[in-house]
Design a protein with these regions (language model features):
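Feature of extramembrane
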Residues: 1-226, 230-235, 367-572
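Membrane-embedded transmembrane helical bundles of large multi-pass transporters/channels
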Residues: 1-43, 129-130, 145, 149, ...
């Protein structure tokens, strides 16, 4: 179909066009029901990463899943009534202690009560020989004292807090076990709170879905304020808002079919599409008001042929910038890149299909005064060299602080600060000095060989020397055998059945594999965690298991360190690809490598300024902020494209270079500023979800979008005035 015929169709049958497009949009949008939210940090690592592969193997062989920790508080948690409540809750959640989770989904449960029961089960005179909670307060305190340092992972020194830890199977119904746990703690008088990976993940999932519902109306509100400031016209508001709303519905409907897994960063897609989609509508609407023809079809054809082309170029380059995230080794980045890429395409389609019919139906004819933009254009032209020099100085200063840019993977930064589960988990971490996350070591060897057990015990002692709490079957054996490892295998044949009956032995049926659980200190920096994981692995490497093998540590801490190790490499990789592809696209679009290179100069400046922004705002690269550079390449290039496209258009009309540059800034100035501010307004909504990682993301990306605008308006003219530009 020729462009003139397409333009005529849009304005001659506007209601029909809008009706058909609405039907298609809601048919696609119906697939949004397939979307689901994940909050596990492990999804940020590629499946072939050794830490993930080992954890997957352990989870499959041992059916290991998430953990639930019940945080117990009281004036004296060793009070018999409190201990009875702990015992009651434990039995309600884990009624079948010996089933390995096959019936109740709980592989093992550990609390101060289970340790007291173990001590009490020892033969006289060390215990009563019965696996039960003693009724004597004296006996309870004696058993706790005999536990030594082992009690510190479950009991605070002031006896005002303790914990019950449940390790769950990986095939458990999360909602069902959480409901069961909530019901259990509600039936006792002692204050108890659910924390741990499963409650945290559930809280973050639920909150993330609510946040998406919050962001949308806020983004609309903030963007509407900007639009009303510029246009003061409800018609204009309707014209610029409907297309991005349709594009959001189309995007999430598409994701519901092809990539239904959402993560925390997916929340930003809504704000990005509102901001960028509104930009496209603004460009077409403002150009429409410039045309003076009485024939609306010819005016629409003109804006589609000129500004429409610039919007198409912006769409293509923005899609390229976002699609560079799809070559990431991190699955959530791939899905985020796909969502943004498809969303921008739908934004362009929605804008082209809907804006002309809306202009026709609403008879929009508002004229904009541009005298202020004439003065702005004059300032940009007259001071371009000074502005360029200032930009270069800032760039040099930014590069000087590049070594100060850090990387960080902090799960709590992805969690809303006002969520009770998160607050209690952080409080628990501070009081017990550990994160509560599961870190494990897989050991293969003959577990009935005392030498193997001694090697494991020696390794655990080295772990404890560096502040790591470790527990394995060896600790259970020593507790039953009066603090010693048996010298003969025959004694082990009698001890293992007792441990298995108590649910305290992570060993396989052949006694050839076992797991060591670790509790690492909380509150460390990512660099300290990296050094700690490295030290743990050094201890593992130095441990010799007779005819066996010990694998490196895996679990929450090891995964966070592994993610942190690939963050910088992933950003450089996606950034290089986006710059290369955008440059290639601009060469094809402009049919000139010179114009392509010049158009990218503002983005080059902004990317060089990024380290300075990160250091100034005290923000590290994370699984959220890592995508910013690629987003800026895709979005920030738009401003340069519109100026370049308008400059070439004015040159074709016969204007001299200086006047053409001035005219380009003058005519596109309003649209560019309005587009930048609407994008900022849309993104600003994300700041109100009270998630630190997303707030950092918003601060950096807003700063870089505004600087992209400044670069296009004030720095680009200096290069277009060069003699080589014709």
């Amino acid at each position: 179909m020729r462009l003139s015929n397409f333009a005529e169709l849009l304005v001659k049958r506007p209601k029909t066009v809008l009706l058909v497009f609405t039907i298609i949009t809601f048919m696609v949008g119906s697939q949004v029901a397939n979307l689901y939210m994940v909050s596990d940090m492990g999804v940020y690592l590629p499946k072939n990463e050794p830490t993930v592969q080992l954890l997957d193997r352990i989870e499959q062989e041992w059916s290991l899943g998430s953990t639930i920790i019940i945080y117990v508080e009281g004036s004296d948690v060793l009070d018999l009534d409190v201990l009875k409540d702990i015992d009651k809750v434990t039995q309600l959640i884990d009624p079948y202690r010996h089933d390995e989770g096959k019936l109740d989904g709980v592989i093992t449960s550990t609390s101060i009560v289970t340790l007291i029961k173990q001590e009490n089960s020892l033969p006289y005179p060390f215990g009563t020989g019965k696996y039960e909670l003693p009724g004597s307060e004296y006996q309870i305190k004696r058993y706790v004292a005999e536990l030594g340092n082992a009690r510190k992972t479950l009991l605070t020194d002031d006896l005002t807090a303790t914990a019950i830890t449940f390790v769950l199977r990986n095939d458990i119904d999360a909602d069902k076990i959480l409901a069961k746990a909530e019901d259990a703690i509600s039936n006792v008088h002692t204050k108890m709170t659910l924390i741990g990976t499963l409650p945290m993940n559930a809280a973050i999932k639920e909150r993330s879905i609510r946040n998406m519902a919050i962001i949308f109306p806020l983004a609309v509100l903030f963007t509407a304020i900007v639009i009303m400031f510029f246009h003061r016209d409800l018609k204009g508001l309707l014209i610029v808002f409907l297309p991005p709303i349709y594009s959001i519905i189309l995007t999430f409907g598409f994701l519901g079919v092809f990539a239904p897994e959402l993560t925390m960063i997916s929340i930003a897609i809504v704000a990005l599409l509102i901001g960028l989609g509104v930009d496209y509508s603004i460009h077409l609407m403002n150009r429409f008001t410039e045309e003076s023809s009485n024939n609306i079809a010819s005016r629409v054809e003109k804006i589609l042929r000129t500004t429409g082309k610039a919007v198409l170029l912006s769409t293509a380059t923005t899609m390229i910038g976002f699609s560079s995230l799809m070559i990431s080794a991190m699955p959530p980045m791939i899905n985020f890149g796909l969502g943004c890429t498809v969303g921008i395409l739908f934004s362009f389609i929605s804008t082209v299909v809907m804006v002309p019919p809306l202009l026709a139906i609403l008879k929009f004819e508002k004229k904009e005064k541009v005298y202020r933009w004439k003065r702005l254009a004059g300032f940009a032209i007259d001071n371009s060299e000074r502005i360029l020099l200032f930009g270069c100085i800032i760039a040099v200063l930014s590069l000087m602080v590049l070594p100060q840019v850090g990387t960080d993977v902090n799960y709590y930064e992805l969690a809303p600060k006002d969520e009770m589960v998160i607050e209690k988990t952080m409080e628990f971490s501070e009081r017990f000095g550990m994160s509560g996350n599961l870190d494990i070591i897989l050991v293969e060897g003959d577990l009935k060989d005392p030498e193997v057990l001694k090697a494991i015990d020696d390794m655990e002692e080295k772990m404890r020397d560096i502040g790591i709490s470790a527990y394995s079957v060896v600790d259970g054996i020593k507790r039953i055998n009066l603090g010693r490892i048996p010298e003969r295998s025959l004694l082990l044949d009698n001890i293992y059945p007792i441990l298995i009956k108590q649910g305290m032995a992570f060993v396989d049926e052949k006694y050839s594999k076992t797991l060591i659980s670790l509790n690492v200190p909380s509150g460390l920096s990512i660099d300290e965690y990296t050094a700690l994981v490295q030290r743990i692995n050094e201890i593992i490497d130095s441990t010799n298991i007779p005819d066996g093998h010990i694998y490196h540590v895996t679990g929450a801490t090891a995964i966070n360190v592994a993610i942190n190790n690939i963050l910088f490499e992933q950003q450089i990789r996606s950034l290089f690809i986006s710059l290369l592809f955008v440059f290639a696209a601009l060469i094809i679009i402009f049919r000139s490598s010179l114009y392509a290179l010049l158009t990218m100069i503002p983005i080059g400046f902004v990317l060089v300024w990024e380290p300075g922004i990160l250091v100034t705002l005290d923000i590290s690269l994370s699984v959220i902020t890592i995508v910013i550079a690629s987003i800026i390449v895709g979005t920030g290039i738009d401003y340069g494209i519109h100026i370049t496209q308008r400059l070439r258009e004015e040159l074709r009309y016969g204007l001299k270079k200086r006047e053409a540059v001035k005219k380009a800034i003058e005519k596109t100035g309003l649209s560019l500023v309005e587009a930048a501010l609407t994008t900022v307004a849309g993104l600003l909504a994300v700041y109100f979800v009270n998630v630190p990682a997303l707030q950092s993301f918003v601060k950096v990306i807003i700063a870089m979008i505004l600087l992209s605008l400044v670069g296009a308006v004030f720095i680009l003219p200096a290069f277009y005035r060069l003699k080589m530009v014709k």
